[in-house]
C-alpha cells in the first residue's frame, strides 16, 4: 500500500504605482513530476515485477491467499501571477505542469515447465491491483496597466499508469481437494479537475488574455491469467476497469 499526498502552491505578484511607475512583469511557473512503483509479488525477487521464477515456489495455506497492490495519489497544485501598474504595461503569467507516472502491479510470477508457482488455498486466491488519483490543478494570471496589458495561464496534466493483476504462465492453483474462488482484479479510478484562467485589464491600451488547460490520460489496466496455467476452482473471475471523471476549463478575458 502506498499513499501520496501532495500540496503545491506558488503565487507571485508585482505592483508599481505613482507618476513614474513603469511596466510590471510577474511569472509563476510550477513543475511537478511524481513517479511511483507499487508491487506485490509472489514467486519472484522484490522489484522484479516482470521476473520469471528462478525456483519453484509452493504456498500451502489452510484458508485464503491474497496478493494486493494499492497506490492512492492526492495532488493539489495552484499557481498564480499578478502584474499591476498605474503608469505602464502589466504582464502576469502562470504555468503549471504536473506529470504522474505510476506502476501498480500484483503478480504471481511467470513460470516455466521447470519452475513455477503453486498455491493451495481452500478459501480462494485473490490477486488485486488498484490505483486511485485525485488531482486538482488551478492556474491564474492577471495583467493590469494604464497602457497595454497581457496575461496568460497554461495548465498541463499528464497521467500515465500501468496497472496489472497477473497470474503468471504455468501457475498452479488448487487441486482436486482444494477448490476456492480465484479472483483477478485490476482497476484505475481517477478524478481530475484542471482549471486555467487569465485576465488582462487596460485603461487606455490593448489587452490580451490567453488560457489553456490540457489533460493527457494514458496507460493500461489489465488482468490476465497466463498460458499453461492449471486452476482448480469453484469460480474464476478476471476483471479490469478504468474509471475517469474529468473537468477541464480554460477561461480568458
Roles of regions detected by a PLM:
Residues 1-253:
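Low-complexity, glycine- and small/polar-enriched segments
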